[in-house]
């Protein structure tokens, strides 16, 4: 949600800002803008729509060595140029970009900014007017004005501020929103995601909450809000530029679906040695052994991945597992067991709802494990332990490979704990071999893309509604499959436990309603789900079946290679990812950038 880029120094700021914003498109946005300055002039350009629309408005004379840019995902005010960032102060002297939500912006407007004229309806404009007031009316220095504003502002924010009268400096501050400093020779940068600046530098510095940074071309000064200077080491971001591009693919989502066999094999090489022995941080294993209950907290696709691993974790670790929606737990944490441990699943490691839960867990002394794709992310820094899923950059808004990688990573964790406990089922579970078979199963499914596209064209091209049904782990996959379809095709789709159809949902079935049935696990499960298929077919539903090999019958639509039941959700979800992809494609939609959605939800 939203993206920030900024640069000061001996570089072409316009090019860097635009390239950086393009790299942040995947986070989701509805408008964009840049502010560029040099010794002789300043330029502020904003646009509603895509980065390409902004680029079309930039003239050849828009040049400078310092600038800030922003992609906006509307939270306060509609998507208009007036509401797009950067925003300016009352006189236009100060320019600000902001990610986050200022909770007390109405109080600030009433208490401090009476008589000010505002162009838009955003909370960010309130903030930059406040800074401008403190300098131009109260005669504070820029730094003192920024600090005073920060002491008043409540909520989440990542700020990058420029003074058009002294354009050799960028002022930065953050609280609860991600922000990084990029380090260069003769230039320095700020960004909300390392991906935005990876072409310019691989050396980054973390900024923690309630810290202020002053950037010039030759120096980075980090302080707390009281002015105490802080020492902060830098780190190298291991991002491959080839992983960020689409290559020959028309969309990132299809590329990322195709990468899943490689991701499975990467996880094997990461979490198992050459002899197949599982290697997981012993401290994580011990912490789980000491817990009497595991609580998986997540949102969206990661929440569904948690469900898909619940049975496996319980069976292999002998520890009860509960699932929680992070956005709900942030407000009301239920009665916990005596020795709880939290597992937070987040592709980005920046999910604001999950962080809200983690802050509470830390305050309560509850050990936590973050399972994420991004090293150095907020959740990974603030949790007790971190386990990386090594899926590589995931650019498409609709998550695919992160979901399957989360399940596979948790399989290694479950087996490691089970082995440490001497659980025979864990000792017998040849995870390296079984996950290799999963990779082969994915490849087999991917070789049937034309078949899936054909089935989708007949089923989903014009419909407004659809349903997924399944039992056991297939129900959990159905929830994820339904989310994927609704995210990128805009088809109203729900995933239901097949056994619940008779308890209400079947009333929604009418002539030609698409119902996609998932069948794996056992003959008993298959028999019961096929009974549900007959029920919906009798009411006119158009049924498509995705069936595990060995449970298939003549007339089934998509057959998936049989894999170990613990890992079946990985194999079974692949056809549903392709179904969502082709449904979106055939409906003429932007697969990678669905409307109203953001890749990383960094505000609560």
Swiss-Prot record:
Annotated signal sequence range: none
Pfam families: GATase_6, SIS
InterPro entries cross-referenced by the UniProt entry: GATase_2_dom (IPR017932), GFAT (IPR005855), GFAT_N (IPR047084), GlmS/AgaS_SIS (IPR035466), GlmS/FrlB_SIS (IPR035490), Ntn_hydrolases_N (IPR029055), SIS_dom (IPR001347), SIS_dom_sf (IPR046348)
Protein keywords: Aminotransferase, Cytoplasm, Glutamine amidotransferase, Repeat, Transferase
Domain named Glutamine amidotransferase type-2: residues: 2-218
Major subcellular site: cytoplasm
Enzyme Commission number, as recorded: 2.6.1.16
UniProt-listed PROSITE patterns: GATASE_TYPE_2 (PS51278), SIS (PS51464)
Active-site residues from the entry: 2 (nucleophile), 599 (for fru-6p isomerization activity)
GO annotation, cellular component aspect: cytosol
Record SUPFAM superfamilies: N-terminal nucleophile aminohydrolases (Ntn hydrolases), SIS domain
GO BP terms, alphabetized: carbohydrate metabolic process; fructose 6-phosphate metabolic process; protein N-linked glycosylation; UDP-N-acetylglucosamine metabolic process
Gene3D superfamilies listed in its UniProt record: Glucose-6-phosphate isomerase like protein, domain 1 (3.40.50.10490), Glutamine Phosphoribosylpyrophosphate, subunit 1, domain 1 (3.60.20.10)
Subcellular location, record wording: Cytoplasm
Catalytic activity: D-fructose 6-phosphate + L-glutamine = D-glucosamine 6-phosphate + L-glutamate
Domain spans labelled SIS: 284-423, 452-594
A molecular-function term among this protein's GO annotations: glutamine-fructose-6-phosphate transaminase (isomerizing) activity
Primary role: Catalyzes the first step in hexosamine metabolism, converting fructose-6P into glucosamine-6P using glutamine as a nitrogen source.
Complexes and interactors: Homodimer.
Name by which UniProt lists this protein: Glutamine--fructose-6-phosphate aminotransferase [isomerizing]
Gene expressing this chain: glmS
């Amino acid at each position: 949600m939203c993206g920030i880029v900024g640069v000061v120094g001996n570089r072409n700021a316009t090019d860097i800002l635009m390239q950086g914003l393009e790299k942040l498109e995947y986070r989701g946005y509805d408008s964009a803008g840049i502010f560029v300055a040099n010794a002789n002039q300043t330029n502020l350009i904003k646009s509603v729509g895509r980065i390409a629309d902004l680029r079309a408005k930039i003239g050849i004379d828009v040049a400078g060595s310092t600038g800030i840019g922003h992609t906006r995902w509307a939270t306060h005010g509609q998507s208009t140029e007036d509401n797009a960032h950067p925003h300016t102060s009352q006189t236009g002297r100060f320019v600000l970009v902001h990610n986050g939500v200022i909770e007390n912006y109405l109080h600030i407007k009433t208490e401090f900014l009476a008589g000010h004229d505002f162009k838009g309806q955003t909370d960010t404009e309130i903030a930059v007017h406040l800074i401008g007031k403190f300098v131009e009316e109260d005669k504070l220095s820029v730094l003192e004005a920024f600090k005073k504003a920060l002491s008043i502002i409540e909520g989440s924010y990542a700020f990058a501020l420029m003074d058009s009268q002294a354009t050799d400096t960028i002022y930065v501050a953050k609280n609860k929103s991600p922000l990084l400093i990029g380090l260069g020779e003769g230039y320095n940068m700020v960004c909300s995601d390392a991906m935005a600046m990876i072409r310019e530098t691989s050396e980054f510095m973390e900024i923690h909450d309630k810290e202020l940074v002053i950037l010039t071309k030759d120096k980075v000064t980090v302080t707390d809000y009281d002015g105490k200077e802080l020492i902060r080491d830098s780190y190298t971001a291991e991002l491959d530029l080839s992983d960020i591009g689409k290559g020959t693919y028309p969309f990132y989502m299809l590329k990322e679906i195709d990468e899943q066999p490689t991701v499975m094999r990467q996880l094997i090489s990461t979490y198992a040695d050459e002899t197949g022995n599982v290697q997981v941080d012993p401290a994580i294993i011990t912490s789980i052994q000491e817990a009497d209950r595991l609580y998986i907290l997540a949102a969206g696709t990661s929440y569904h991945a948690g469900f898909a691993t619940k049975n496996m974790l319980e069976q292999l670790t002998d520890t009860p597992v509960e699932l929680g929606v992070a956005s709900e737990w942030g407000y009301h944490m239920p009665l916990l067991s005596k020795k709880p441990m939290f597992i937070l699943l987040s592709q980005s490691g920046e999910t604001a709802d999950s962080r809200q839960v983690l802050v509470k867990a830390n305050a309560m002394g509850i050990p936590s494990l973050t399972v994420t794709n991004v090293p150095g992310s907020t959740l990974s820094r603030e949790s007790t332990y971190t386990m990386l899923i090594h899926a590589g950059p995931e650019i498409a808004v609709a998550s695919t490979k992160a979901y399957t990688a989360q399940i596979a990573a948790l399989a290694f964790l479950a087996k490691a704990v089970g082995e440490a406990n001497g659980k025979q089922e864990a000792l017998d579970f040849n995870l390296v071999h079984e996950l290799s078979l999963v990779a082969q199963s994915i490849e087999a499914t991917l070789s049937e893309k034309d078949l899936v596209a054909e089935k989708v064209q007949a089923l989903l091209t014009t419909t407004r509604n659809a349903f997924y049904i399944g039992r056991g782990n297939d129900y959990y996959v159905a929830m994820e499959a339904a989310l994927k379809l609704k995210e990128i095709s805009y088809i109203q789709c729900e995933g239901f436990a097949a056994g619940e159809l008779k308890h209400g949902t079947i009333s929604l079935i009418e002539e030609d309603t698409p119902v996609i049935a998932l069948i794996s696990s056992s003959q008993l499960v298959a028999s019961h789900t096929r009974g549900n298929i007959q029920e919906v077919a009798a009411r006119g539903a158009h049924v498509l079946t995705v069936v595990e090999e060995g449970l298939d019958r003549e007339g089934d639509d998509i057959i998936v290679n049989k894999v170990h039941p613990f890992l079946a959700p990985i194999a079974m979800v692949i056809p549903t990812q392709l179904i969502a992809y082709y449904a979106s494609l055939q409906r003429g939609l932007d697969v990678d950038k669905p409307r109203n959605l953001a890749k990383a939800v960094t505000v609560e």
